[in-house]
């Protein structure tokens, strides 16, 4: 599969000298942010990514660890001049490298030089990334192994939609992938099962939950007078497989916003990112009274929402940690296979905590009831948290941040004991 690209890679890497490697490594090490590093604490160098950064921020605020950071994009770009584009394949890259000792040697030299240069500022006790199989992390894993530094993962991937686990198992088998780091922390037991074929010892996969949700656990219910939002979480992207449904939902949502204008309710469309925001802004009907946002945190938005509308989205799982009512629009549905859904509307446990609008008329009626101030919340706190726990581990005691701290310190101590 990789024979021609591998030959090209060998030629390219052969031309990349030891001085080139050292120069690239020094340059990359200068990009590390050492903000708020406290002397005497273990220091973890993290490869900063979207979402993952939310977990790191919680860890920084609620553990006794330092977290220095470097952009994962910069780690990737530092290697692009000598790793051909057609070889930069997630999951597959690790086995490919191990087909040639010379390639391994140069990657290890780069990773090792980067870590040595970084450690001249502050000793690095562990490195932590957001994925266990990204190609650009292989050099850092090799450098960590050479220097006796634990390479850890706090996985931002969470394989709780049923089809994703067999898909990952097959991908791991096809790629002959093995994780060459020290340990993986993940958010759910389903994710541990999904990742297990790629990790030599399943005990090195810890189920910790997600630190970003620690602050959600003690959200106090807001009085009805403060619940002034009706919130639509967008699902217009092709991956949802429900673009026509979203168009109908958006049109009805906009119509209600116009009809209820000036009555003290904000009809908010929560977009995923700026591009999503611009697309939605261009298609909303004239005369609406919608507010659009892409950067308002759900943590702030859901507690003041009377109703949250969404479809096959982690945002609806997150809403289970609040007392916001939730509705899934469910008509003209092309995806009938339950394995495709994060929350299956035909599951009785889901229907106990979430409204399922099976027609446009049912959906419109729920919007009207929310506008009138009716309390539409379904399910008890325990039922809602049980649904959340299907997808994200909730600690029996303590916090996810504490569980991740324990995970990190375990491997730091293990590495220290083997030196």
Region spans (language model):
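C-terminal alpha-helical cap of glycosyltransferases
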Residues: 394-419
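Conserved catalytic-core segment of nucleotide-activated headgroup transferases in glycan assembly
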Residues: 211-283
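A nucleotide-sugar donor-handling region in carbohydrate enzymes
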Residues: 7-30, 155, 171-241, 372, ...
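Donor nucleotide-activated moiety binding/catalytic core segment of transferases
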Residues: 114, 272-322
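N-terminal subdomain of nucleotide-sugar transferases
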Residues: 1-78
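Catalytic binding pocket for nucleotide-activated donors in carbohydrate/polymer assembly enzymes
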Residues: 199-202, 207, 285, 314-392
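Active-site and donor-binding regions of nucleotide-sugar-utilizing enzymes
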Residues: 46-57, 74-215
